[in-house]
Amino acid sequence: MTDVIGESTSIDLDDKYQAEKGSFFFTGVQALVRVPLDQMRADRLAGLNTATFVSGYQGSPLGGFDMEIIRHQELMVGQNLVHRSGLNEELGATAVMGSQVSSVFPQQNYDGVLGIWYGKAPGLDRAGDAIRHAQYAGTSEHGGVLALTGDDPANKSSTLPSASEFAL
């Protein structure tokens, strides 16, 4: 008789963040958490020593993003990933902008820093000035910035119905 099940393999729930090959399943928020980890793996293969700095304002619809990073903090430490919640969206965006100017200092700890800002659409409105200045300042040679914005058109968790298309 032919064995149709195949060999037993063990699966660890942290594979979605740690495995470098193979198939694994995760939610959209978990996929966003994996993005900086994959980027830093690619950087290391290219001979770069990089880090990631994540900041934004907690709350839905992207509230699960920061909670997922915090939930798996022990995995992030070895990956040079630092998460600091902002007091508001604007301060989070300003902190991410600061991660890009590290290259101007003579003694750098990293070749580059990936900055990730997150917030919902009303927060994007609030952070607009900081984000505009960050765009003009640019990023470091081996850094970059990713902005994650969650919309709330049904006004489930915001003070007003919101969408980010126009602000972006």
Predicted ranges, named:
Residues M1-L168:
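Thiamine diphosphate
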